[in-house]
Amino acid sequence: MDSRLALATEEPIKKDSLKRYKILCAVLLALLVIVSLGLGLGLGLRKPEEHIGSCRKKCFDSSHRGLEGCRCDSGCTDRGDCCWDFEDTCVKSTQIWTCNSFRCGETRLEAALCSCADDCLQRKDCCTDYKAVCQGEVPWVTEACASSQEPQCPEGFDQPPVILFSMDGFRAEYLQTWSTLLPNINKLKTCGLHSKYMRAMYPTKTFPNHYTIVTGLYPESHGIIDNNMYDVYLNKNFSLSSVEKSNPAWWSGQPIWLTAMYQGLKAASYYWPGSDVAVNGSFPNIYRNYSNSVPYESRIATLLQWLDLPKAERPSFYTIYVEEPDSAGHKSGPVSAGVIKALQLVDDAFGMLMEGLKQRNLHNCVNIIVLADHGMDQTSCDRVEYMTDYFPEINFYMYQGPAPRIRTRNIPQDFFTFNSEEIVRDLSCRKSDQHFKPYLTPDLPKRLHYAKNVRIDKVHLMVDRQWLAYRNKGSSNCEGGTHGYNNEFKSMEAIFLAHGPSFKEKTVIEPFENIEVYNLLCDLLHIQPAPNNGSHGSLNHLLKAPFYQPSHAEELSKSAGCGFTTPLPKDSLNCSCLALQTSGQEEQVNQRLNLSGGEVSATEKTNLPFGRPRVIQKNKDHCLLYHREYVSGFGKAMKMPMWSSYTVPKPGDTSSLPPTVPDCLRADVRVDPSESQKCSFYLADQNIDHGFLYPPAIKGNNESQYDALITSNLVPMYKEFKKMWDYFHKVLLIKYAIERNGVNVVSGPIFDYNYDGHFDAPDEITNYVAGTDVPVPTHYFVVLTSCKNKTHTPDSCPGWLDVLPFVVPHRPTNVESCPENKAEDLWVEERFKAHIARVRDVELLTGLDFYQEKTQPVSEILQLKTYLPTFETII
């Protein structure tokens, strides 16, 4: 086609397009002008309305000055002539706890929850964010972390106030998972210090743990052993909904507010279990009767008002409590939108507190602790054990849930005669997939300290995580979440955070138990604590300048002599050794018991690397017995070792240990026959045999075995228990020595017949080997100590130690483990782990004190002693 023809035909098309384009542009331009004029007119019209018809600074003013065509008085709604901003400026401003652009400089509103008026700072009723919103100050949550060795307190505050803030059911994992949604709490975590978690006491319930936190006492000691309980001496029932909750007869111990008041300080509590009870006849100086209907903001605002009191009236110590995220966790479970919303709610409340403190220039003056009482775990109606599946008829009363107890229905008449043993027997080892273990309360793990109180019923069920135990189907709600479980479960771990001039900054600390908080609070207040179950000084590492410096316990019974005088015994004690046929052979092995001074020093260095245990019991006649492979502290009155200490190095090979030399026992020539056990003692008792505290074959050679095949190494053991004890030493001890590059072992008997967690007086021991005066232990302890830095061995450890202590019940059967038709490797280690303990628990049960010659500050030794190893990994 000719190019000119092509151009000719395209020209009309281009002209039409251009015409349409011009029309479209004109239309758009016109629309733009119209919109601009509309906006201009609208804004122009609005300006006089804002100036003439706005309620700003005129709320509830009946004079109508400066208003045309609308009103801002309280009757305008009924008349229908309110100004356009009346609702936002006048009504909503009385319903919120914050300032905004409408409120800044407002006329004072009498009904307002807080003020944003220009004189609010002077009148001390500002909303907590007044300075940030109305004066442009940087909010606390976004400002940089403060750092100062000295308190930054305003005039009138000679000592930093202490605030204890509890967020019920805030499990430690929440803070790890949702910290980005919690800016205020996360700021505290970043700038202050926090623990990986804080361990709650058992049962992990609200009232027992809150009262433990403020008394430093175990629930068995302070009396609030559960949220629901019966006291046979009072013949009354306690529950959170009953009037008995306010009866001081239930509440023992000295809560921190009373400790402070007794020493001249004032204390205030905006809720805390026990704070609205006349404990010991007294309330805190300022307190509120509990009501869950009071908004969190109101609680915070009131606490801030208490801080504004004149110096002579102002408290030094404050508690505040909020119900979330516990309530949401119960309703929806721990992994739920409801819990996230509740976490944000408590974060906002905490942020309000910190903004209020900053507004008073107290944010770097106050020592504040934020913690929880326990965690939360998921439950389901698919995970419930019903007692009707175990009994044809339920003729007992049961406290249901995650920490069940069983007692008689007929109270008080049958309380003490109820056959608890039969209930435990009928519930033991019934199913292969049974999700609880029944215990008589005295047999519960000693680390729980949950036995010595008449309110703790004698039958107890330890329930698997996320399971419940009920009487029968349909007896209670089972969906959602709950707590109360074994306090070693990770889901029961609680938060602990702290911030203030006394605390270290930007620090993460190892987990600890909440019984230690009371002593910490006393140190912050510079007062002396009442007697409690905590270990004072164990939390010194949280503080920049600790108020209290602990010291080692004083030894109350010195060791006497058990010297070597003759190589042949005065009395054979009915003992014999087939391997030693002549007196010359016996004399030769006995000479090994006569160590030189150099040999004593060598065995002390190897087998007592941290010093011998000190005896804190009074009038405990004992002597030290030295051997090349172990050292013993021999108790003369009980005719057995109180403790034995030895070190097991990491073995060069993993071959099994040789058998113990058979049919070989002899009298220890260093111990008087009247203070020794006879080998014939065990012939009459069909259920008890002799065991060895120090395992003779642990070193692998016969010569050293003879040093242990002596009467001073004998302890009475139930035959079933001995199977477990022997397996531990032959297999597990070697395993731990391999894993830890050697372990120092201290083991011994425990006597706790009154199950109070402390060593018994002689007249409290009630069971003896048949026909003898040899007492039968209630438990045996084993404390394994290694170097935390595993490149070092226990006897050459320059730094921190690691511990693995056990307190295992000494019982005639192993029914706790249901071992029938099971190999020992399937249940023995699990049994030992179930009875893990703290070194401090061992000390209380034995009257011994460990690690006195370890070159480390005593406060650091206390950290070691109060450490509880855990094996739980599932949240």
From Swiss-Prot:
Record region (Phosphodiesterase): 161-545
Locus of motif Cell attachment site: 79-81
Reaction(s) the record says it catalyses: Hydrolytically removes 5'-nucleotides successively from the 3'-hydroxy termini of 3'-hydroxy-terminated oligonucleotides; a ribonucleoside 5'-triphosphate + H2O = a ribonucleoside 5'-phosphate + diphosphate + H(+); ATP + H2O = AMP + diphosphate + H(+); CTP + H2O = CMP + diphosphate + H(+)
Database matches in Gene3D superfamilies: 4.10.410.20, Alkaline Phosphatase, subunit A (3.40.720.10), Extracellular Endonuclease, subunit A (3.40.570.10)
Cofactor(s), names only, from the UniProt record: Zn(2+)
Topology class, membrane: Single-pass type II membrane protein
Membrane listed as a keyword: yes
Nuclease: region residues: 582-875
Residues the record lists as binding Ca(2+): D752, N754, D756, H758, D760
Active site: T206
Pfam families: Phosphodiest, Somatomedin_B
Post-translational changes noted in the entry: The N-terminal is blocked.
Tissues where the protein occurs: Detected in intestinal epithelium and liver (at protein level).
Enzyme nomenclature, EC number: 3.1.4.1, 3.6.1.-, 3.6.1.9
GO molecular-function term, one example from the UniProt record: zinc ion binding
Source organism, top-level taxon: Eukaryota
Cystines in this chain: C55-C72, C59-C90, C70-C83, C76-C82, C99-C116, C104-C134, C114-C127, C120-C126, C145-C191, C153-C365, C381-C478, C429-C818, C562-C623, C575-C679, C577-C664, C787-C797
Residues carrying sugar: N237, N280, N289, N533, N574, N594, N702, N789
Keywords of the record: ATP-binding, Calcium, Cell membrane, Disulfide bond, Glycoprotein, Hydrolase, Membrane, Metal-binding, Nucleotide-binding, Repeat, Secreted, Signal-anchor, Transmembrane, Transmembrane helix, Zinc
Extracellular compartment residues: 31-875
Biological processes annotated in GO: ATP metabolic process; basophil activation involved in immune response; negative regulation of inflammatory response; negative regulation of mast cell activation involved in immune response; negative regulation of mast cell proliferation; nucleoside triphosphate catabolic process; phosphate ion homeostasis; phosphate-containing compound metabolic process
Function: Hydrolase that metabolizes extracellular nucleotides, including ATP, GTP, UTP and CTP. Limits mast cells and basophils response during inflammation and during the chronic phases of allergic responses by eliminating extracellular ATP, a signaling molecule activating these cells in an autocrine manner. Metabolizes extracellular ATP in the lumen of the small intestine, and thereby prevents ATP-induced apoptosis of intestinal plasmacytoid dendritic cells.
Family under the similarity heading: Belongs to the nucleotide pyrophosphatase/phosphodiesterase family.
Subunit structure of this chain's protein: Monomer and homodimer.
Name of this protein: Ectonucleotide pyrophosphatase/phosphodiesterase family member 3
Source species: Rattus norvegicus (Rat)
Lineage: Eukaryota, Metazoa, Chordata, Craniata, Vertebrata
Name of the encoding gene: Enpp3
